[in-house]
Amino acid sequence: MAEKVRDLRSALALLEQMPDQLIETEVEVDPMAELAGVYRYVGAGGTVKRPTKEGPAMIFNRIKGHPDAKVAIGLLASRKRVAALLDTQPENLGKMLCKSVENPIPPVDLEGDAPCQQVVHKAADPDFDLYKLVPAPTNTPDDAGPYITLGMCYATHPDTGVHDVTIHRLCTVSYTHL
């Protein structure tokens, strides 16, 4: 068995070892409709008509207008991949989810510098621009804007101070707002 998945890098490493589960391309793609179109035919295995077929996850290494960015798409698009990433079988995913909800793991506070904080962009910075920072794809010309489709939001309730992490589909609506 490969090393346990603990972050995006180890997840990609695992998928690379699995036949037909990850494709990487060096061909430049435009995040405006082209990226989603390529994935629709390669990763989703055809059109969006149901049933969507299972295809590989993809990494786009060259994004038009974003010379230092890559886009990973479809990492969680099949039960087979999700099960492999969680070191279980597809038929066990429901039970695993139920068990995790019933037995939450408390957060771990780490001392020192966090690797995820090596690069920090703040909306108050004069050159802050979400359109330049995030190569979020616009799936069709009719979309409201570029979407981060698996956006992780860390939020704090303004009155209680309770924190939570949630997953949302986030649309970039201005250079400072999602």
Across the structure, where does each feature detected by a protein language model lie?
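Extended, highly charged
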Residues: M1-L178
